[in-house]
């Protein structure tokens, strides 16, 4: 019994075609068998577009506020604006610190100067010094100071020492230095001496006229 060769060839071809099965994976056709897959130009174009889309989707994000930009140039300008704002803020903080330090120093130095001025410019001291200086300059006779000056000039040492102690206490009370009180005493004593000499001359003149 003879076999038709055509029939055997067709059976082989049908069995071969049935053994070659195509499998699709992620849009690509994979052929199981000895045959290699044929990649078309369309598939190559789609793969290239996928790679380019990945590069385009790269993010340009600001490190200060997290805002996204399309390109690096826009991102750089935005970050420069952030840097300028931060520098301006630091300058304002430094100016505020300098102002607070200056205010602190002026408030702590002012009480020292005012206390020094108050010590030598109290109303009692001004009245005390002006009263005696004006009396000496205008020639007004003051019994209290004339009696003390006579005691200083003609009294004993104990009286002078007591008066010096009293004047020292008065100076401490009114903020007057001892040398200023001594100067005022000298002025009062000289004025009293001149008054006593003038009165003596007047008495002698009247006595001569009467004789």
Curated annotation (Swiss-Prot):
Q: Which UniProt keywords apply?
A: Cytokinin signaling pathway, Developmental protein, Differentiation, Ethylene signaling pathway, Gibberellin signaling pathway, Metal-binding, Nucleus, Transcription, Transcription regulation, Zinc, Zinc-finger
Q: Where is this region: Disordered?
A: 1-20
Tissues/organs with expression: Highly expressed in roots, young leaves, developing stems, branches, inflorescence meristems, floral meristems and siliques. Expressed at low levels in rosette and cauline leaves.
Biased composition, class Polar residues, residue ranges: 1-12
InterPro entries the UniProt entry points to: GIS3/ZFP5/ZFP6, Znf_C2H2_sf, Znf_C2H2_type
Question: Which intervals hold the zinc fingers (C2H2-type)?
Answer: 60-82
Task: Spell out the subcellular localization from the entry.
Answer: Nucleus
* SUPFAM superfamilies according to UniProt: beta-beta-alpha zinc fingers
Q: What induces it?
A: By cytokinin and ethylene.
> What's a GO cellular component annotated to this UniProt protein?
nucleus
Biological process terms from the Gene Ontology for this record are: cytokinin-activated signaling pathway; ethylene-activated signaling pathway; gibberellic acid mediated signaling pathway; regulation of DNA-templated transcription; regulation of timing of transition from vegetative to reproductive phase; root hair elongation; root hair initiation; trichome differentiation
Role summary: Probable transcription factor required for the initiation of inflorescence trichomes in response to gibberellin (GA). Acts upstream of GIS, GIS2, ZFP8 and the trichome initiation regulators GL1 and GL3. Binds the promoter region of ZFP8, which may be a direct target of ZPF5. Is not involved in the regulation of trichome branching. Modulates root hair initiation and elongation in response to cytokinin and ethylene signals by directly promoting expression of the CAPRICE (CPC) gene.
The miscellaneous remark of the record is:
Plants over-expressing ZFP5 show formation of ectopic trichomes on carpels and other inflorescence organs.
Name this protein carries in UniProt: Zinc finger protein 5
């Amino acid at each position: 019994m003879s076999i038709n060769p055509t029939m055997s060839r067709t059976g082989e071809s049908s069995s071969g075609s049935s053994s070659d099965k195509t499998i699709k994976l992620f849009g690509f056709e994979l052929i199981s068998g000895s045959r290699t897959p044929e990649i078309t130009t369309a598939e190559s174009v789609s793969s290239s577009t996928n790679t380019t889309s990945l590069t385009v989707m790269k993010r340009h994000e600001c490190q200060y506020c997290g805002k996204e930009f399309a390109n690096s140039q826009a991102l750089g300008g935005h970050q420069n604006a952030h840097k300028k704002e931060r520098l301006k803020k630091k300058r304002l903080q430094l100016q505020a610190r300098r102002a607070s330090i200056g205010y602190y120093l002026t408030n702590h130095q002012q009480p020292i100067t005012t206390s020094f001025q108050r010590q030598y410019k109290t109303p009692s001291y001004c009245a005390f010094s002006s009263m005696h200086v004006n009396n000496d300059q205008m020639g007004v006779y003051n019994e209290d100071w004339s009696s003390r000056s006579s005691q200083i000039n003609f009294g004993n040492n104990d009286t002078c020492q007591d008066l010096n102690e009293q004047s020292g206490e008065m100076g401490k009370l009114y903020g007057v230095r001892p040398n200023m009180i001594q100067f005022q005493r000298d002025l009062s004593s000289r004025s009293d001496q001149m008054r006593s000499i003038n009165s003596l001359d007047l008495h002698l003149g009247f006595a001569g006229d009467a004789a």
